[in-house]
Amino acid sequence: MVASHRLLTLMVFALLTIPMISGLISDKCTEGCKSTIGCNTRCMMRGGGYCESAKIHGAVKIFCCCNNYSNSPISSPVIN
């Protein structure tokens, strides 16, 4: 039972870190989110943003992550 729990924990860890290693998370997230309002302002043209915490090398770091919505009303051209 303990071995299967450890295996499951390892699999979840791998699934969470693979996108970060490959650059999928780091492309839309930057380190140093001080407030959600500031992150939303920085990511306004991408559909807003949010603060996300992640544990990297044993330390918890907070990132500002942009939504990257391609159909955001702010970033989409107006069609009349």
Curated annotation (Swiss-Prot):
GO terms for biological process, alphabetical: defense response to fungus; killing of cells of another organism
Secreted in keyword set: yes
Family: Belongs to the DEFL family.
Name this protein carries in UniProt: Defensin-like protein 85
Coiled coil: none
Signal sequence, start to end: 1-23
Organism: Arabidopsis thaliana
Transmembrane residue ranges: none
Compartment(s): Secreted
